Amino acid sequence: MAIDEISIASFAHRFDNKLDLIDVREVDEYESGHVSGAVNIPLSEFVGRLNEIPKTTVFFICRSGSRSMQACEICVDAGLTSVINVAGGTMGWIAAGREVVLGGQPE
């Protein structure tokens, strides 16, 4: 099954903090700047935390789009098929002039 990808421009157009967005970078990367509302589940912990992935459409983001694609593939292999990779990742988000927030998980 092919994994859906969304461009930074299209994602920014759809983004509203109500989307399920998971950032799969490591904790220190996440805390140094992430898309507002993104929940951090590092790829290194991902398989053990699959039960935390919502059953709705979920967007995945990382630094550039590579690790988030791996997370999407893991989800598909586990039967979670409504996953979308944010191509370009957080670097693309920042390059597009979008804001990031610092610190830990959203409340």
Predicted regions and their residues:
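Rhodanese-like catalytic fold shared by cysteine-dependent sulfurtransferases
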Residues: 1-20, 27-57, 67-107
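Short, surface-exposed ligand- or partner-binding patches at beta-edge/loop junctions that are enriched
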Residues: 61
